[in-house]
Amino acid sequence: MKICAINGSPRKRGNTARLLSWALDGVKNAREDAETELINLYDLSFTGCRSCFSCKRVNGPSYGRCAVKDDLAPVLGKLADADGVILGSPVYFMGLSGMMRCFLERWLYPYLVYDAARSSIAPKRMATAMFYTMNVTEEQAGEAGLPALLRPMENFVERIFTRPYVLWCYDTLQFRDYSDYVAPVFDEAHKQQHREECFPMDLKEAFEVGHHMALGELREFDEHAREHHHHDHDHEHEHHHDHDHEHAHGHDHH
């Protein structure tokens, strides 16, 4: 079994990279013989789709695979026979990082068929997951419509492979020392507290994603998580006004 994690963040020790590392630890926890690899996109020199259409040419030598020869080519070769792929990206300007977007164009497009059946010619319908890290809170992300903006790419991943498990990591600690940067909108004390209280749970969830992916149980885990999140969301909504009242004079989260 081979499972790869794709880091779409420029930082190798940041929030996104840590989540991916924990996910791969979960893979190893489930199956010691599993082969895992963390690939940092920002170490590679590549572009998005070049629109050469070699992957679509009838009887062409590169039909169904990207013909561009650059640093991403061997990565795409590795992924072709992987059993699972975990994608991680920070949210930049309400979307994926540029490198992650470029990667997805190159990875997905060769397998997409222009037919009425919306066919996929991917070698495997492998398990997939997408991890998002962001500065905003869950409430702010919802108000801004972020889930709807990211969902189209999730749908393409599902069309080509399988429905991805989606992990949302909100309100991240962006700087080690906020006094070194001009960012007065953020409350560092709140950010630190949120990291101490919530980030360990995000890491645990990432670990569980890798664990269940390795066992072939990711879909069941995803369905259970969705049901649990829906229940928690309804419960939080019941006490929303009390929560707002308690924090009316507290930290500014915006």
Where are each of the predicted segments found?
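Short, catalytically relevant binding-site loops at active-site mouths
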Residues: Y92-M94, V136-T137, L173
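Cofactor-binding loop segments of dinucleotide-utilizing enzymes, especially the Rossmann-like FAD-
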Residues: G8, L41, F131-T133, C169
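Short aromatic-enriched loop/helix-cap "lid" or pocket-rim segments at secondary-structure transitions
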Residues: G48-C52, A141-E143, R176-Y181
